[in-house]
UniProtKB/Swiss-Prot annotation:
Protein name per the record: 4-hydroxy-3-methylbut-2-enyl diphosphate reductase
Organism taxonomic ancestry: Bacteria, Pseudomonadati, Pseudomonadota, Gammaproteobacteria, Moraxellales
UniProt binding sites for dimethylallyl diphosphate: H41, H74, H124, S226, S227, N228, S270
Gene designation: ispH
Pathway given in the UniProt record: Isoprenoid biosynthesis; dimethylallyl diphosphate biosynthesis; dimethylallyl diphosphate from (2E)-4-hydroxy-3-methylbutenyl diphosphate: step 1/1; Isoprenoid biosynthesis; isopentenyl diphosphate biosynthesis via DXP pathway; isopentenyl diphosphate from 1-deoxy-D-xylulose 5-phosphate: step 6/6
The organism of origin for this protein: Psychrobacter cryohalolentis (strain ATCC BAA-1226 / DSM 17306 / VKM B-2378 / K5)
Keywords on record: 4Fe-4S, Iron, Iron-sulfur, Isoprene biosynthesis, Metal-binding, Oxidoreductase
């Protein structure tokens, strides 16, 4: 059985930064270090950080006044930010800079009194944070749509003063269809200068298309609550390739590969390489060949840590 390995795969720059922020905070400060929501959507990563002292909570009221809290990579609403300031919390913001870019876009549309349309998945923390960045005091409204049917039912205040943004981890193909529907219904709608779907999401979706074109089965390493990982599985399935989303190698079933000559492996942007290697090892234990890594776009994006976490340890407290 041939094994193909997608490239790029796994951690993106935003995830690297978010995990590094928690790690640095754990090194520099006395516990407890609170993290609002899973810092990234991966069970292995969250469990590892929790074992080293991070305390994960869902809401800010679970964090005692005056404590250290880290906001997850998905971002938070302005109300959460304001509450943290009111309660004298020391905040390290692990929001991905590409999510922050969308927050800035939304805030500008609100400031201009426009309506905004957010393309995204209801209930996802990134969507909740972005919706919460829209200030209604200037007369505008923000609307959430997930698909073309939502666009068909959408009613806005002024179709001539309307803009859209998107969640960063969506399917590129699905989003393109929703944007087309918006432009058809609202010809004057404004959009971002550069696509809001992040570079890592785009690159991993392109890579899984390549993978699915070669393989009978595709394994996506990622947690069930990871938006970008789910989109990878769905994309492989749309290319008529059987696909499974797995947290780790223990979730694999040997029967999936009965009579299979080729299998592909990729990973969502919040899945660490160690989990990918465990999957590859299990496939080889079941008779797979040495993995062949496919060519792909080389990623060299990096994001800086907050200034307070870049100060050399020898200067902390001076």
């Amino acid at each position: 059985m041939q094994i193909y390995l997608a490239n790029p795969r796994g951690f993106c720059a935003g995830v690297d930064r978010a995990i590094a922020i928690v790690n640095e905070a754990l090194l520099r400060f006395e516990p407890p270090i609170y993290v609002r929501h899973e810092v990234v959507h991966n069970k292995f990563v969250v469990s590892d950080l929790a074992n080293r002292g991070a305390v994960f909570v869902e809401e800010l009221h679970e964090v005692p006044d005056g404590s250290i809290v880290i906001f997850s990579a998905h971002g938070v609403s302005k109300a959460v930010e304001d509450e943290a300031e009111r309660r004298d919390l020391t905040v390290f913001d692990a929001t991905c800079p590409l999510v922050t870019k969308v927050h800035i876009e939304v805030a500008k549309f609100a400031q201009d009194g426009m309506d905004a349309v957010l393309i995204g998945h209801a209930g996802h923390p990134e969507v909740e944070g972005t919706m919460g960045r829209f200030n209604h005091r200037h007369g505008g409204q923000i609307h959430l749509v997930e698909n073309e049917s939502d666009v068909e039912a959408l009613s806005v205040q002024d179709a001539e003063r309307l803009a859209f943004v998107t969640q960063t981890t969506l399917s590129m193909d699905d989003t393109a269809r929703v944007i087309d529907a918006l432009r058809e219904k609202f010809p004057s709608i404004q959009g971002p200068r550069k696509d809001d779907i992040c570079y890592a999401t785009q690159n991993r979706q392109d890579a899984v298309k390549d993978l699915a074109g070669r393989c009978e089965v595709v394994l996506v390493v990622g947690s069930p609550n990871s938006s970008n990982s789910n989109r990878l599985r769905e994309l492989a399935e749309r290319m008529n390739c059987r696909a499974y989303l797995i947290d780790n190698a223990t979730e694999m079933n040997k029967s999936w590969f009965d009579g299979i000559q080729s299998v592909g492996v990729t990973a969502g942007a919040s899945a660490p390489e160690v989990l990918i290697q465990e999957v590859l090892q299990q496939l080889q234990n079941w008779g797979g060949d040495l993995p062949s890594e496919l060519l792909g776009i080389e990623e060299n994006v990096t994001f800086s840590l907050p200034k307070a976490l870049r100060i050399p340890m020898t200067q902390v407290g001076k």
